[in-house]
């Protein structure tokens, strides 16, 4: 089987390409902090056994008295919300290199994992709950996105696609399929375009300002065998290993299925499948010379 790799560079003003189809959605409800939200986020995001972030606070230690910890978190979050400023200490990531398989001395055989401060994940969980209520429960999220949603899985997507293709093949039609893999999709997000996508999806007010500040001024450092290297600024993408990262990515690509003038596009996170139906390939190429 032959494969084709296509590299596409998206310009900073790429939002303008989709503006005619990506209409502004109803405005989101203002973000509010309360003990119930913090406790839900704490239970969901703090998992004993997970690695600690730059502050070295362990999940197991925080779980020992989660009510007292949640109360302390509430003060920090409320002050952060008032100023629309994400705590700078929570914008730092610790990166470690983990072998892909066994022991290796080759640089390419390692993959980086990013460790965030656990309190930041709790705060992200509170913010993410508000985004989900607006974006998913409000029906704004594209039905073609199968990732990051409760009740949806790769198995359901595969069944959906293969059944649709089978029905067309039974009609003696031809199915053309293009499997698209976005290289470093989460790391390549342009923050300027992300801001425009947030506005178009109805995210405004203190939540919008907080997310923009959350993305800006982030830093990371590499840790090797306990040795901490120099911090570096992160100017693109959403934080790896974060709670908000997948949600922001979903907003970023939410209008992608509406871009092709023909065919069908389905996504599971950044894995994308584009399919077209036709009787004869030559005829389809003449009629649909561009997608």
List each model region and its residues.
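Surface-exposed loop/turn segments and immediately adjacent short secondary-structure elements
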Residues: 1-108, 114, 122, 228, ...
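Mobile genetic element proteins and their domesticated derivatives, centered on retroelements
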Residues: 4, 38, 53, 73, ...
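Short helix-interrupting loop/turn segments at helix-coil junctions
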Residues: 6-15, 48-52, 71, 83-88, ...
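Hydrophobic (often cysteine-bearing) scaffold residues that line and stabilize catalytic clefts
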Residues: 34, 54, 58, 65, ...
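Inter-domain linker/hinge segments that demarcate the starts of reverse transcriptase
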Residues: 35-46, 72-80, 126-131, 155-168, ...
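Conserved catalytic palm subdomain of right-hand nucleotidyl-transferase polymerases, strongest
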Residues: 48-57, 95, 106-115, 156-196
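Conserved pre-motif C helix in the palm subdomain of viral-like polymerases
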Residues: 108-139, 156-162, 183, 235-262
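Conserved polymerase palm-domain catalytic core
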Residues: 182-269, 277, 281
């Amino acid at each position: 089987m032959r494969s084709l790799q296509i590299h596409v560079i998206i310009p900073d003003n790429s939002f303008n390409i989709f503006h005619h189809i990506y209409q502004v959605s109803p405005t989101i409800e203002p973000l509010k902090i309360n003990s119930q939200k913090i406790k839900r986020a704490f239970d969901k995001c703090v998992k004993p056994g997970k690695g600690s972030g730059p502050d070295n606070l362990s999940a197991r230690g925080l779980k020992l008295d989660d009510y007292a910890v949640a109360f302390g978190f509430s003060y920090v979050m409320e002050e952060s919300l008032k100023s629309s400023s994400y705590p700078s200490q929570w914008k730092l990531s610790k990166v470690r290199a983990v072998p892909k398989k066994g022991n290796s001395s080759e640089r390419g055989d390692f993959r980086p994992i990013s460790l965030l401060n656990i309190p930041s994940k709790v705060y992200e969980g509170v913010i993410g709950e508000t985004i989900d209520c607006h974006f998913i429960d409000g029906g704004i999220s594209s039905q073609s996105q199968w990732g990051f949603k409760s009740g949806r899985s790769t198995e359901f997507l595969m069944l959906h696609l293969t059944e649709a293709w089978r029905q067309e093949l039974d009609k003696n039609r031809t199915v053309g399929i293009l499997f698209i893999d976005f290289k470093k999709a989460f790391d390549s997000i342009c923050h300027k375009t992300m801001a425009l996508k947030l506005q178009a999806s109805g995210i405004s007010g203190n939540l919008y300002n907080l997310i923009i500040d959350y993305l800006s001024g982030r830093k990371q450092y590499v840790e090797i065998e306990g040795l901490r290297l120099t911090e570096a600024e992160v100017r693109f993408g959403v934080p790896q290993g974060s709670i908000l990262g997948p949600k922001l990515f979903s907003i970023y690509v939410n209008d992608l299925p509406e871009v092709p003038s023909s065919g069908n596009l389905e996504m599971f996170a950044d894995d994308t499948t584009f399919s077209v139906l036709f009787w004869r390939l030559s005829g389809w190429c003449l009629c649909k010379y561009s997608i």
